[in-house]
Amino acid sequence: FSTMQMMSKADVLDKFRPDEFDFICIDETHRAGAESYQRILEYFKPQFLLGMTASPERTDNFDIFDLYDYNIAYEIRLQQALEENLLCPFHYFGITDLEIDGETFDDESGLRNFVKLVSDERVDYILKQVEYFGYSGDRVKGLVFCSRKDEGEELARKFCQRGYRARMLSGDDSQAVREEVIDRLVSDTREDYLDYVFTVDIFNEGVDIPEVNQVVMLRPTQSPIVFVQQLGRGLRKSDDKEFVVILDFIGNYKNNFMIPIALSGDRSYNKDTMRRYVSEGARVIPGSSTIHFDEISKKRIYQAIDSASTNDLRTLKEAYSNLKQKLGRIPKLKDFYDYGTIDVTKFFDKLGSYHEFLKKYEADYTTELSEKEEAILQFISRKLAK
């Protein structure tokens, strides 16, 4: 066993022959595009190379599937993992974030208004909710995700003023400090234990804290990937908890439509499917997990769904690139359905046909159609999209 940081050092690599190991397992392999990972992967020549990741969909266009000859040995998503009882059940509550002076937190002003983000009124409101919805176990062991470092620092300070033990962790803290703070959070014997750890994004991935029994989200949803990563910090099973409580404080953000996408695992970006999940998610979530949105949160999510552009080129290109990397070839229309990714009619709506998308954005696509054939294809595609 070795950490990536240790093994990527030249003097450490030199201690091993390229064929030293028959089997190598790379954890967090979605990071394999980084120079340090590449140094390791290019040096060793094992007989069998296995990669593991909880984030196979990338936004940086690096093809991790190519490293493994597009051979996916096993894949399991959140919904299936819950069905098979591999994860701790969760109770998700979408809670309306506080209005201050008649104003809601939104994309235009909310995240920039530091005074309102950390106001006593908001802190008291947050604490009222975390105390009301509670946790499983003898004491709370919570992670709080914020939008900004200074917000997390000030909120942690104000939690402490109100009798809670809290600490902010950021990317500026060393690995030793992070490990010490996590130990204080999970320990039941230390006198300097912590109730809450605030952070921005250093716990999105690669951190295993099974004891966490409450996750508080005080930031807008950046993407379905990040949402599931942060939700997942509480989904590891532990003898000390029966379930984890997820509290999502929902402002008036344009990305709110991503919440049902993340929770459902449905990547079709179909607006009717999103709306249905907001109203019926509690019925269809597997096992003993539950999902609940208060009425104002529902309204905000519906508004975000209505105004969302779900067939913009960035979304289409990202969905296409992820599927192409997984398959190792240009996807067929049926592949999008088989692999549960974006609704193909989004391509029809945006560009008239999938052929037109490939012609413009896929360098390896060589199929040519006559003007008449293209017109017929676009006519049929647009009819299907309606």
Question: Predicted segments — roles?
Answer:
Residues 2-23, 34-39:
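Conserved helix/coil segment N-terminal to the catalytic DExD/H
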Residues 12, 153-155, 164-203:
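Conserved helicase ATPase core of P-loop NTP-dependent helicases/translocases
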Residues 30-92:
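Post-DEXD/H (motif II) to motif III coupling segment of the RecA-like Helicase ATP-binding lobe
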Residues 72-143:
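Conserved interdomain linker/interface between the two RecA-like ATPase lobes of SF2 helicase motors
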Residues 131-132, 136-137, 259-385:
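Long, largely alpha-helical accessory region at the distal end of helicase-like NTP-driven motors
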Residues 140-148, 169:
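Conserved RecA-like ASCE P-loop NTPase motor core of nucleic-acid helicases/translocases
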Residues 195-220, 226-229, 233, 244-248:
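A short beta-strand element within the Helicase C-terminal
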Residues 224-229, 233-264:
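Conserved segment of the helicase C-terminal RecA-like domain
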